[in-house]
Amino acid sequence: MMLSPDQAADSDHPSSTHSDPESLGGADTKVLGSVSDLEPVEEADGDGKGGSRAALYPHPQQLSREEKRRRRRATAKYRSAHATRERIRVEAFNLAFAELRKLLPTLPPDKKLSKIEILRLAICYISYLNHVLDV
């Protein structure tokens, strides 16, 4: 499932939200913008005749902070780094579930459990152990 830049902002790694563009892609890195980047801005002379390319597209310094963030996130380098961070996060998450699974008694012992089953079984087992300690 693809996320829009607005949805992705909520799920990004916290350290990536305060980085400047040069640290992620460099000043000369090519970036992809959104469709709104292609809309012409008002021309300085206002005569409506075909102006220069600079008059049709906003200068990077004229972009809002949010638009700069969207462009930075569109770089291949940023996407690759984000994918790497996400892969590491998911691997750590799965490893934690595997460790929790090893601590839970099941029959048969090698039965494959889903993550929700592991959590529910852990809740029941902890409740049981609390009850045993209280008696």
From Swiss-Prot:
Tissue and organ distribution: Expressed in developing neurons. Transiently expressed in the cerebellum during postnatal development, exclusively in the premigratory zone of the external granule layer where postmitotic neurons undergo initial stages of neuronal differentiation. Expression is not detected in mature neurons. Expressed in the anterior lobe of the adult pituitary.
The bHLH domain, residue ranges: 77-129
Region listing for Disordered, in residue ranges: 1-81
Gene Ontology terms, MF aspect: DNA-binding transcription activator activity, RNA polymerase II-specific; protein dimerization activity; RNA polymerase II cis-regulatory region sequence-specific DNA binding; RNA polymerase II transcription regulatory region sequence-specific DNA binding; RNA polymerase II-specific DNA-binding transcription factor binding; transcription coactivator binding
Entry-linked Gene3D superfamilies: Helix-loop-helix DNA-binding domain (4.10.280.10)
One GO process term, biological-process aspect: hypothalamus gonadotrophin-releasing hormone neuron development
Deleted gene: phenotype: Disruption of the hypothalamic-pituitary axis in both genders, but female pubertal development is influenced by the presence or absence of male mice. Altered female sexual behavior and reproductive longevity, with fewer pregnancies over a shorter period, abnormal estrous cycles and reduced ovulation with aging. Reduction in neuroendocrine gonadotropin releasing hormone-1 (GnRH-1) cell number and altered location of these cells, and morphological and functional abnormalities of the adenohypophysis. Ndn expression almost abolished at the level of the optic chiasma in the hypothalamus.
Skewed-composition ranges (Basic residues): 68-81
Pfam families named in the record: HLH
UniProt subcellular location: Nucleus
GO cellular component, one term: chromatin
InterPro entries from the UniProt entry: bHLH_dom (IPR011598), HLH_DNA-bd_sf (IPR036638), TAL-like (IPR040238)
Biased composition (Basic and acidic residues): 10-21
Primary location group: nucleus
Keywords of the record: Activator, Developmental protein, Differentiation, DNA-binding, Nucleus, Transcription, Transcription regulation
Role: Transcription factor which binds the E box motif 5'-CA[TC][AG]TG-3'. Involved in regulating energy expenditure, body mass, voluntary physical activity, mating behavior and reproductive longevity, acting through the hypothalamic-pituitary-gonadal axis. Acts as a transcriptional activator of target genes, including Ndn, Pcsk1, Mc4r. Is also a transcriptional activator of KISS1. May act centrally to regulate function of both white and brown adipose tissue.
The protein's assembly and partners: Homodimer. Interacts and may form heterodimers with STAT3.
Protein name: Helix-loop-helix protein 2
Organism of derivation: Mus musculus (Mouse)
